[in-house]
Amino acid sequence: MYLSLLLLPMFGSAVTGLLGRKIGVTGAHIITCSCLITSAILAIVAFYEVGLCNSSVSINLISWIDSELMDVSWGFMFDSLTVSMLLPVLVVSSLVHIFSVDYMSADPHNQRFFAYLSMFTFFMLVLVTGDNYLIMFVGWEGIGISSYLLINFWFTRIQANKSAIKALVVNRVGDMFLSIGFFAIFFVFGNLDYSTVFSIAPFINETIITIIGLLLLLAAMGKSAQLGLHTWLPDPSMEGPTPVSALIHAATLVTAGVYLLLRSSPVIEYGPTTLIVITWVGALTAFFAASTGLLQNDLKRVIAYSTCSQMGYLFMACGLSQYNVALFHLVNHAFFKALLFLAAGAVLHATYDQQDQRRLGGLIGFLPFTYTAILIGSLSLIALPWLTGFYSKDLILEVAYGQYEFSGQVAYWLGTLSACLTAFYSLRLISLTFLTYPNASKSVYLHTHDAPTIVMIPLIILSLLAIFFGYVARDLFVGMGSDFLSPSLFTHPSHITLIEAEFGLPQIIKLLPAIGTLLGAGLALYLYHMLPVFTIDLTNSTLGQKLYRFFNGKYYVDVIYNHYIIYGGLQLGYVISKVLDRGIIELVGPYGLATGLTSGSKDIAKLDTGNLTSYALYLAIALVTLIMILLSPVLLNAALINAPLILVLLVAMVCIPYINSSSNDTVTTVQVKL
């Protein structure tokens, strides 16, 4: 069953990709959707057997690398962490496949799209089920190339090409640090198996553990779009098909970095410096992304920046050693983020791909079902009480404050402020898209229609999960005394603060995020729905324009990267190419050798003057040189006499050909004049 769960998506991808012309579009839909739905059902069964019944499964297929100390097998492990990751990955992926049947119905390349989508899911399954770091690396690189293919699915668009390359290159930075980290793990531990590495980690020097932890953190920052390596995230949401955005942002690519930290918890727990850095990175990313999303106008880009912000919350939880809370929020986030992106796709599908919120408005009467789906997803995103997001997002802030350390306090206040900003831009999105006066052209509203039944099914399922899953699964993931994740995640005893956060915090600290959320949501509705004149006046003011350009321009991070890093790198490459490749290497390489031999042969040819006295001089110089070589032991004692003589002879040898050549030219000139 467990291998079937893993291989079915790959089977669907291979059949659809290789036999797409034979089976047709309908066949591609049936095969890929059937494989994914079956895998999702098997994942639910595996969650019951492994997670609830506490019966972990390990499968060792064949040996892969057996070279002296290095022994790596194709092995897969199903523990509580693995099955918890399989649940959102396969449920969301199967719903995205169903949604794509209608969304991509007019595209002529359906078979290729569904093959890429299933391959993407397969590599994510490889990443989360592998029992060693090398198999994780296979899945890690696989989702990277799959995301490139999906973002660049409409490859005739230059912007899609550029976005795919940008995503691939930025992720290469994280991949480089991941490779170095795995080399460091093998060098220190002598093995890449999780069980071996985790059992030896407590006995390794803290400095070494910190270095390995920081390398893994930098790798996770690339995949999970943390501050500094976040620039690739909005582009796939803009240029790829919307189902791709839902899969990338909800369940696969961006969660891979968080999974790396969760799986490596037995290692990074022994590096306190690493944990502090992770906390700061997460807190700063959450605030940065939330403030950047405030004044974005593209519908999908706003949701994309909310993903970046929520990944910051997950990093905060990992840095605070609350890995079970991070996993709980990861699963919750997958459901309501997939709901938001698929509902946004339904809006785009109904409005002829109009993504600018300012050119929409008034859609609540035309798309009531889609409006309800986006409303549920947004309310769960802002952690409205008793929805799914509330049970995990607020808990992250509580455990941050409950640490009673400086990094925890900073994380709490930045996270609370980010929650206010998240509520603001979420309700701003709803207001501009659905509640304000219609701003689109009349032709758009004439043909606007709500989602068909095949699109409603995924939205209904995700809406129910966004409402009820947090309440149902809370005690299992983060309940007091729950040992559901204890076999998979490790928290050092000195870092256990969940009880203090639950019972020891002042009530105002617990209520403050909810109060800020309500204030942010109310302010957005007031400014954009009830009093838009004030917003227009603020935009026309000098201060308002500067603030708008700053936040809409994403803190000018792309400008800084382009001007100081990319442009500087291109200039450095030009200088290296000019001085080294086309300079020194050419000079000492084939070109320099050929040129030198040609020039030297011409200089030697000038010695053949045809003058008898020149030949006599050459013979005399050769004879003197031979005598000096033979008598060098004796003459070395008279260096002051020997050196000037040698210098005179060398100068004579060099100058004679040119003197002869000059005299010959003079004679020729005189003869011509006569």
From Swiss-Prot:
Its main location: mitochondrion. The chain crosses the membrane at residues 27-47, 81-101, 113-133, 135-155, 173-193, 200-220, 242-262, 275-295, 301-323, 325-345, 363-383, 410-430, 453-473, 514-534, 556-576, 616-636, 639-659. One of its GO terms (molecular function) is NADH dehydrogenase (ubiquinone) activity. One of its GO terms (cellular component) is mitochondrial inner membrane. Gene3D superfamilies: 1.20.5.2700. GO terms for biological process: ATP synthesis coupled electron transport; electron transport coupled proton transport. It is found in: Mitochondrion inner membrane. It is an enzyme of class 7 (translocase). It is a multi-pass membrane protein. It holds the Pfam family Proton_antipo_M. It catalyses: a ubiquinone + NADH + 5 H(+)(in) = a ubiquinol + NAD(+) + 4 H(+)(out). Keywords: Electron transport, Membrane, Mitochondrion, Mitochondrion inner membrane, NAD, Respiratory chain, Translocase, Transmembrane, Transmembrane helix, Transport, Ubiquinone. Its EC number is 7.1.1.2. InterPro entries: NADH_DH_su5_C, NADHpl_OxRdtase_5_subgr, ND/Mrp_TM, NU5C-like, Proton_antipo_N. Belongs to the complex I subunit 5 family. Core subunit of the mitochondrial membrane respiratory chain NADH dehydrogenase (Complex I) that is believed to belong to the minimal assembly required for catalysis. Complex I functions in the transfer of electrons from NADH to the respiratory chain. The immediate electron acceptor for the enzyme is believed to be ubiquinone. This is NADH-ubiquinone oxidoreductase chain 5. It comes from Mycosarcoma maydis (Corn smut fungus). The gene is ND5.
